[in-house]
Amino acid sequence: ACGSKQQQEDGDDVNKKDAVRYLCNWSQGYTRRSLAQVWADRSGETIDWFTDVLAESGIDFRHEIDEKQEGDNYEVLDVGHSTQYGDEYSEQLTMDAVLKHAEADGLEVQYEITMVKLEKDGNRVTGLIAKNANDEYVRYNASKGVILACGGYSGNETMMNALQPQSVEQTCINYSKPGAKGDGIKACLWAGAIMDQTHTSMIFDRGAIKPDQVGEYGKANDGALFWMGSQPFLKVNLNGERFMNEYMPYDLVLHAAASQPYHTYCTVWDSKYPEDVERFATHGCSRLYPHVNGTAPVFPIEYIEGMNADLQDQGYIVQADTVEELADKLGLPKDTFTATVERYNELAAKGEDKDYGKEDYRLSTLSEAPFYGVRQSGGYLICTMDGIQIDDNMHALDHDFKAIPGLYVIGDMSGNYFSGSYPCLM
């Protein structure tokens, strides 16, 4: 958000012009600039409202302040706010809190309702037809209009293959919400609305595959969630060669890997990884230590240590006493991998990445056994980010780029925001 009460109290508010510029640049100009301005102007009060609603249920929602160091390769804007779950991580907690608040205001909720089609009188949307849990058709009449928040289409294999084959290939695990089938988007298209011209997904580089597996061309992988995957440890291709600056926004790592054999790579680290991770000072949900202002991360390092132990038990993460043994267990050419590690250790010792330009404090050595590694191919698919094009009042737009009366679109199924990549550093 921009302009929340917490940001202002922390003296860490974000310049709205910078935020809008950032969004538009990240989408290669596909963002509707005036819509981004609406977000910049209204997001602060929205976050304030959400903070108060969660507080009614005893849930803390806090602003995140992160380090900004000279020489950083990527600009970071402290727009993030996150739920402080404590020991009980469950998205259901926040959903229950919002539902409780809404029902107190008179909201009626009906469950297991599937979108079928919109109904129109002339050009105006007047209601919709849906199916209930008994597979019965239900008509909803709407005198003021219909607001659709049906989610994206990341759970619709046909739509994903048709619109985002590159995202399918870069998916290791699909964490789509159950309703993300594209029903709302299709209903809008049938009613005369238009969709974004470019199609993209939110995919984080946190997928693990077994040491004897590789990514498949044109197909999604079947792996496990490896949350530490976004940490900028040394990453090598199947030839044992370093091929990237490992500190890049989540999906950019997957884009870089797309030009490597079987779009598969290995992430490797040693026994001192907790102190390395703290020094790396990553941002957003990849962060594993408290933020500068004390806001807790989504998952603390202690939780990740347990997750890694489980992945090791399941045969995803391998452990070795020597670098040569690590190469064997990951199926890498021993001589090439050993030379790569020696070179990387040399760069880290000198504090300058002359090969790929990574920040000095995000370099680390592989020097203290035991050593660990994991194969990665594709990531953690959360949702699609393209959708129905909307105006600044959230009206769906028709083929003449005019608002369709009575039809509003919000959430993951709305468009004109993103293209190509998710701006995870905002």
Residue ranges and their predicted role:
Residues G80-S82, T158-A162, F418-C424:
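Short acidic, glycine/proline-rich loop/turn micro-motifs
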Residues A133-E136, Y140-P211:
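Glycine-rich loop(s) and the adjacent beta-strand/alpha-helix scaffold that form part
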Residues I185-A187, A191-K329:
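An anion/pyrophosphate-binding glycine-rich loop and adjacent beta-alpha core
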